[in-house]
């Protein structure tokens, strides 16, 4: 049956990538259909009940700055919030939240069901409709055919998924959900480059069987309580609860070692490569054999359940081994396992087969986002989904694609890494992956992206008004500190010494004093009984006031470093966005080695910047490309430059 309505965009999959993709396309005014095998699992947190972390929190803030749902849903469902690396520099500080699974999922579903231009339909997709080299629709398991001008595929771990517990295995997309076997077979017919990856999850524990009296309590941050969304407030949060800490020990490790002969990872049953930075407990014990203990965090799954997630013991060992290793840890001697841990193998597609827009190079109108591209994590998936949804919408509207630059967003770093370098293991975001991380902080994600999002059509009026209010307030406050002067007469020794450590000997602007290492915005404006405090209308909005204080202090204290980084971006970006024609014949470039020619022909980079980051492409090869392009421009054969990938169409 052909469904009577033709859509602009179809999104296949209702996880973190799919929900952001569908919401983004719909916000842009595209008639959008989200197809999911089960409406009840929209936005489900398949593994750990947390959002954010180092690098990941930055992505969540960027998704939020572009109007996405993940951050605000976390504020509505988060039951513990912490700022990681709070004692370090602003570039690496990151927000992390424990989320109530039920509340988070409800917040996502509420937004999906109330988003104009978005329809939901519960049916697994078994086929794509492809005419020539273009996708035109999708077919569900009961034969309903939906037509669309663009399709976003966000199948997560479901493509030919296989679940492993010990040497037993069965097909599944995750525990309790079927694998997408037919869709996987159909995609194989399209001859897209693909491989197998693996991830895993720990057993879940009944909190009633945990002895909390012998465990270390880990509370969240309380003063102030962090929020994730730029539109969020602490009073949105439900009741806050602690996490708990235990440790593995030598007995735990002996139990694991004794069970390795029945581990699917160590007997060759699992072929897929697992995530390096979220290894299974058996992998930890094997790789770090000299370490006699590993920290394990017991994380609550929600306020209305006794279920706990033991973060750090992801495993695919047989259930009897899982039971013994859990019981070997302090506080868990009598723990009851509610759900066994397992590993899952699944198909992924080589992201080097994608354009920077996340559209397939082989099939027009087909976009890929999330774990299907070889990434791991909710946050990486959500960011890709948002971008794929935006670019699907732009294509439908006849506009140029948009992708943020590496110096503009962690999302830009993520996509550029994927499409130029590919993956050999599940890709996880870290702040260390970004060259320009001092400029890519959590606190300024809105300053970097919200204006672009407004141009793209994904930022609504409420967010736009709030952003402008904040931007204007930060600018005014920065100028106030630069133009407010003090001298020994107006700031006597008894007032200066507690804040500055000594008196001042001449006239200074407040901004100059703020640059001193031990001076904070709060202590500076609190001098002389708050004489220099923030103007009262802003101070009465605690969230806005805190955002202003943070932005102003970072902007003034790190001005020199940020300016130098901006100069570096400009210098390096001179040729970053120089376009390479899609039909470029690299064999015609004099001086390029056969190896380099083959790599460039295989990867088909869209820009000089992308070409430079392909493994094995040397600076000398890039120079030869630039010389060849320049000659072509002089002969009128190629265009010199395209508009910046980092600017909205």
UniProtKB/Swiss-Prot annotation:
Homodimer. Heterotetramer of two MnmE and two MnmG subunits. NAD(+) binds at residues 274-288. Keywords: Cytoplasm, FAD, Flavoprotein, NAD, tRNA processing. Its cofactor is FAD. This is tRNA uridine 5-carboxymethylaminomethyl modification enzyme MnmG. Belongs to the MnmG family. FAD binds at residues 13-18. It is found in: Cytoplasm. GO terms for molecular function: flavin adenine dinucleotide binding. It comes from the Bacteria. It comes from Ralstonia pickettii (strain 12J).
């Amino acid at each position: 049956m052909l469904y009577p309505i033709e859509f602009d965009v179809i999104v296949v999959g209702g996880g973190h990538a799919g929900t952001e993709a569908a919401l983004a396309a719909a916000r842009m005014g595209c008639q959008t259909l989200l197809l999911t095998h089960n409406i009840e699992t929209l936005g489900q947190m398949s593994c750990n009940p947390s959002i954010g972390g180092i690098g990941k929190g930055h992505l969540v803030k960027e998704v939020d700055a572009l109007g996405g749902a993940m951050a605000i849903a976390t504020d509505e469902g988060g039951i513990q919030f912490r700022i990681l690396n709070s004692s370090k520099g602003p570039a690496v500080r990151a927000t992390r939240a424990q989320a109530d699974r039920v509340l988070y999922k409800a917040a996502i579903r509420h937004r999906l069901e109330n988003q104009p231009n978005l329809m939901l339909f519960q049916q697994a997709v078994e086929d794509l409709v492809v005419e020539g080299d273009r996708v035109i629709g999708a077919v569900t398991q009961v034969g309903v055919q939906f037509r669309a001008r663009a399709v976003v595929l966000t199948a997560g771990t479901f493509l030919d998924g296989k679940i492993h517990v010990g040497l037993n295995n069965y097909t599944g997309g995750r525990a309790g959900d079927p694998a997408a076997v037919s869709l996987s077979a159909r995609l194989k017919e399209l001859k897209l480059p693909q491989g197998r990856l693996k991830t895993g999850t720990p057993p879940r524990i009944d909190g009633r069987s945990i002895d909390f009296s012998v465990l270390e309590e880990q509370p969240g941050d309380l003063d102030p309580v962090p929020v994730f969304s730029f539109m969020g407030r602490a009073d949105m949060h439900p009741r806050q609860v602690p996490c708990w800490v235990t440790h593995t020990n030598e007995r735990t490790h002996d139990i694991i070692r004794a069970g390795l002969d029945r581990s699917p990872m160590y007997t060759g049953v699992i072929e897929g490569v697992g995530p390096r930075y979220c290894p299974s407990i058996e992998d930890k014990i094997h790789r770090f054999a000299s370490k006699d203990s590993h920290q394990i965090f017991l994380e609550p799954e929600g306020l209305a359940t006794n279920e706990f997630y033991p973060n750090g013991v992801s495993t695919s060992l047989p259930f009897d081994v899982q039971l013994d290793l859990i019981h070997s840890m302090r506080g868990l001697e009598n723990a009851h396992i509610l759900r066994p841990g397992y590993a899952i193998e699944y198909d992924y597609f080589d992201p080097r087969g994608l354009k920077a827009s996340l559209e397939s190079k082989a099939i027009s109108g087909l976009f890929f986002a999330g774990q299907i591209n070889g990434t791991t994590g909710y946050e990486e998936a959500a960011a890709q989904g948002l971008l794929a949804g935006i670019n699907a919408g732009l294509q439908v509207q006849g506009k140029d694609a948009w992708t943020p630059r590496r110096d503009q967003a962690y999302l830009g770093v993520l996509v550029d890494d994927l499409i130029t370098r590919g993956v050999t293991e599940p890709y996880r975001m870290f702040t260390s992956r970004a060259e320009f991380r001092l400029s890519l902080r959590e606190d300024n994600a809105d300053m970097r992206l919200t204006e672009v999002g407004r141009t793209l059509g994904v930022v609504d009026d409420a967010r736009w008004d709030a952003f402008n209010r904040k931007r204007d307030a930060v600018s005014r406050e920065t100028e106030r500190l630069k133009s407010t002067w003090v001298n020994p007469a107006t700031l006597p020794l008894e007032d200066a010494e507690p804040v500055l450590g000594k008196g001042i000997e001449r006239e200074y602007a407040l901004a100059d004093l703020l640059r001193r290492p031990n001076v904070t915005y709060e202590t500076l404006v609190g001098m002389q009984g708050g004489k220099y405090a923030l103007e009262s209308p802003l101070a009465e909005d605690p969230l806005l006031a805190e955002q202003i204080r943070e932005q102003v202090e970072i902007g003034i204290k790190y001005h020199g470093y940020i300016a130098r980084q901006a100069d570096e971006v400009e210098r390096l970006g001179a040729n970053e966005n120089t376009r390479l024609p899609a039909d470029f014949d690299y064999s015609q470039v004099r001086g390029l080695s056969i190896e380099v020619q083959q790599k460039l022909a295989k990867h088909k980079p869209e820009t000089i910047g992308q070409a430079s980051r392909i493994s094995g492409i040397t600076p000398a090869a890039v120079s030869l490309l630039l010389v060849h392009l320049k000659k072509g421009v002089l002969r009128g054969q190629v265009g010199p430059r395209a508009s910046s990938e980092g600017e909205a169409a």
